Structures are given as C-alpha cells and as structure tokens.
C-alpha cells in the first residue's frame, strides 16, 4: 500500500541556500542565492515557505525559524560533478552524472565551429550568447544574403542554429543540427541540447517558426520516472521537465509560459485524480533573474510564488505529499552569469502530518528524493539515494 497516493514535486529552478562544501572547485565561494536576495530586499516576505520550515533550515533576513514547522526540512548536497539543470534534475531522479554539461558564455571553441563548417559546407556567424529575437535582428539579413548559419548559445548548455527557411531548407537545417549533435557528444563540447531555430520574414520583421526541433540527450540511465511509468503510475511533467528528461518516463506533459502559469498547472493537477508523481519546474527564477543577475526581480518572483502556496495547501489531501526543492544555485549577486554550486533546500509536507514536522538529516545527494518516491510507490530503487519516507511521520 502506498503511503502517499500522489506526490507533488516542485523544483524552484536555481534557488540555492548557500555555498556547497566543494563550491571553491566551481569558482563559487561565498555564493548564497536566497541569503543574498533576502539581504538585497532588506527581508524576503515568504510566510508560507517559512511555515513549512524554510527558516529552520537556516535563518535569513525576513526568514526566521518557527517553533512548530508544518513540514520536514533539511538541505541537500549535490553529488554529481555539474551545476546545471540537467545534472541536478537527473540526480533528483536517481542518476549520478560524472561528466558536467558545458556552458559557453564566451561562445563555442574555434575547433568545433571549423569542424561544423567543414561538414556542412556553410559558414558560421554569431557565436555568442544571445536572445533568439535579438540575434535575428542583428544577423538575420546577413544570413539570408550569404546562406551562413547563425550559431548562438544562452546561459544554459545549448547550441542553437538559426537559418531562414527559404535560404536553408528545413531538411538541411535538421541534418546540420544532427551533425552538431554528433560533434557535441565529445566531452569537451558536451551540450545538453542542440536546437534548430528556423525563421521566416524580411529584415526588421523576422519571426521564428514552430518548426523548432530539439536534439537532446536522453538520461544516461533509467530514472525513477521510467520505473513509475513502467509500473503504470502517472508521471505528469509540468514546465520544462519533459525536455530535461527528453520525454523519458513521462506519461503526460503540460507546457508552461511562466512561473505563475506553472503554479496554475500545479493547481490543475491537484484537481486531477491520479496515482503517481506530478513534477513541476519553475524556470523563471533561473532564466529571467538568476542569469541576468537581477536580485530585485528574483526576490519579487520568490514572493509571488510564495503567495500562491495557500492555494496548493488547501487542495492537498491527507494522502498527498508535497516536496519542494531546487536543482542548483544561481546567486544574482555573484560575479558572472553562471549557476552557482550550492546546497538546495528540501521541504516535505502532507496534511496528514498532524504533529507538524522536524529536521531531517542533511542529504548527501539529490537522489534521496528519487529514492523516497520509488519506495513510496514500491518500484525499483535507484542505484543512488537513501529514502527518507519512513522518517515522515503521520
């Protein structure tokens, strides 16, 4: 008999809670995503996360300990060697990743692009981090006139190739992206995703078409999600979860436009009758505020998210479990634009916890979440991770 019929897992993308013990190896000494945002805001107002026990993990400005937290609380340390979204999420579901995905804030190495030019017969322009619309405004006309390929990246581990559909036919663009995917399986160039970004229109009025195609990497092994799906449990992926796992172990995928849309979709799944896992990623914290080093925007987004939690609490049933965590840090006060190697918070709450919660031991790997989910549903346990299911008292 499952202890919980439904588990709702929420990943607040990049919401770290202080430097990890190995932060120095990543150039991240002193990083502290929530702590620094709380200082910047002169106190973060997150009363619902505080009720669950956020301040009991660690007190920060505006975030204090409570006598009787509603939930169980601790922090988790990442075991894998990367600090990117895919590594963090894959570890949460029971995998250990010893090859970090690469990010290219200065653009891609010349050797890689030379090889891509040679194999495709087309010149490459761009080669820098940029937003998709800005790069088209800047280079779209040149691409049309020369037949070159616009190659660009973002703060994430991606290589994107844009070309006008009337200049480079879709079939050819897709072939080019497959070549790029092969080249980037090499450890030193390993990107999580290669993306075909076709566009149409005239200079000054370019638009990206729906013919985008992603060439992702599948997880390097079976995850707890695969085990759940194969045992006929529901795995509802909300936001970019399905992309992160390349659809592996997903039974239903709900796309989101924003954090608030993500919270709406979470409420929708709370209203659904299912048995299994609802898995939500809230990406705005990372994409809109962390990489852009915007502590004010980040703080406001955290407060907006917190204000939606009472709606979630009200719909949770006695046999539901809510787990809230993060996948890495992205301290908006830290130098640079990259993620930061930090501990992440873990909060666990069910309305059946009548006595309230208490501190859980520090988790040595994010995979403890996957192990807990697996044990709850009686599916094969992951190779990594220790379940804390029996420590959650009703």
Swiss-Prot record:
Key word Cell cycle present: no
Cofactor binding description: Binds 2 manganese ions.
InterPro entries: Alkaline_phosphatase_core_sf, DeoB, Metalloenzyme, Phosphopentomutase_DeoB_cap_sf
Pathway: Carbohydrate degradation; 2-deoxy-D-ribose 1-phosphate degradation; D-glyceraldehyde 3-phosphate and acetaldehyde from 2-deoxy-alpha-D-ribose 1-phosphate: step 1/2
Single annotated GO MF: magnesium ion binding
Name of the featured protein: Phosphopentomutase
Ligand binding (Mn(2+) 2): 286, 291, 339
Location(s) in or outside the cell: Cytoplasm
Cellular component GO terms, alphabetical: cytosol
Task of the protein: Isomerase that catalyzes the conversion of deoxy-ribose 1-phosphate (dRib-1-P) and ribose 1-phosphate (Rib-1-P) to deoxy-ribose 5-phosphate (dRib-5-P) and ribose 5-phosphate (Rib-5-P), respectively.
The entry's keywords: Cytoplasm, Isomerase, Manganese, Metal-binding
GO biological process: 2-deoxyribose 1-phosphate catabolic process; 5-phosphoribose 1-diphosphate biosynthetic process; metabolic compound salvage; nucleotide metabolic process
EC class (word): isomerase
Cofactor entry: Mn(2+)
Origin superkingdom: Bacteria
Membrane found in the keyword field: no
Pfam families to which the protein is assigned, alphabetical: Metalloenzyme
Major localization class: cytoplasm
The enzyme's E.C. designation: 5.4.2.7
Family, similarity comment: Belongs to the phosphopentomutase family.
Reaction(s) this enzyme catalyzes, per UniProt: 2-deoxy-alpha-D-ribose 1-phosphate = 2-deoxy-D-ribose 5-phosphate; alpha-D-ribose 1-phosphate = D-ribose 5-phosphate
Xref: HAMAP family: Phosphopentomut
Positions contributing to Mn(2+) 1 binding: 13, 327-328
Lineage of origin: Bacteria, Bacillati, Bacillota, Bacilli, Bacillales
